[in-house]
Amino acid sequence: MAQREEAGPSSVDPEDVARFDRIGEDWWSADGPMAALHKLNPVRVAYLRDLMSRHFRVEGLPRDRYAPRPLEGLRILDAGCGAGLLAEPLARLGARVTAIDPAPRNIEVARRHAEKSGLSIDYRMTTIEALSGEAATFDAVLAMEVLEHVLDVAGFVRCCGALVRPGGLMFAATLNRTLKSFAFAIVGAEYVLGWAPRGTHDWRRFISPRELARAMAAADLSAFDETGVVFDPLQGGWRLAHDTDINYMMAASKRR
């Protein structure tokens, strides 16, 4: 059984932790309660791969994003990793991944799945606040589809920023707080289409790009990219777009 690392005050919402912990093995079911996240994953991975390949140069040149392992050697922290849906593809791209989550069953499922997949990922049941008290830093820290579930966004981002090395990056993916996001992400996704279990999201916790950029600035991070993610019903999948009214991703750098 996963053992929790010692932690002080945290931004963790116990109700959300329990909700995601109950998903268990179904995290890895492409047709299960996390089906929408499975469909979103290729877009997230490509976005992260492309920006990190450009930023973390080798001998002064951008990395080849289409190489088998373009993220070779990069130390990445996946904060709020769930059962490892994002951590695993990043490890396959060559990254040395540390992935944390406060839900014990998530970490147990993630470890078993990584072992079956032959991947070495450092999974820890802990919080971002506890980890930020350590001396370690990372080339990139990810907060993907997690900010809308924490109680203190500014505090969470601040802890993420503390774990980014000078010259490193932070990435976040979340939901904008607009009428459009309420209609599509709450009413549509949870109550009409059933893409996510009802109660997964609280619209009041959604974060505007301006609010997120402000939180990043307070954490000594400078946002340099803001990209929307939209669902394409014709293709049945997600794609990058200029529209940030619902889902969006943001990248920020830390001064060298």
UniProtKB/Swiss-Prot annotation:
Its EC number is 2.1.1.222, 2.1.1.64. The keyword Methyltransferase applies. One of its GO terms (molecular function) is 2-polyprenyl-6-hydroxyphenol methylase activity. Pathway: Cofactor biosynthesis; ubiquinone biosynthesis. One of its GO terms (biological process) is methylation. It catalyses: a 3-demethylubiquinol + S-adenosyl-L-methionine = a ubiquinol + S-adenosyl-L-homocysteine + H(+); a 3-(all-trans-polyprenyl)benzene-1,2-diol + S-adenosyl-L-methionine = a 2-methoxy-6-(all-trans-polyprenyl)phenol + S-adenosyl-L-homocysteine + H(+). Gene3D superfamilies: Vaccinia Virus protein VP39. The keyword Transferase applies. It holds the Pfam family Methyltransf_23. S-adenosyl-L-methionine binds at R44, G80, D101, M144. It is an enzyme of class 2 (transferase). Keywords: Methyltransferase, S-adenosyl-L-methionine, Transferase, Ubiquinone biosynthesis. Belongs to the methyltransferase superfamily. UbiG/COQ3 family. O-methyltransferase that catalyzes the 2 O-methylation steps in the ubiquinone biosynthetic pathway. This is Ubiquinone biosynthesis O-methyltransferase.
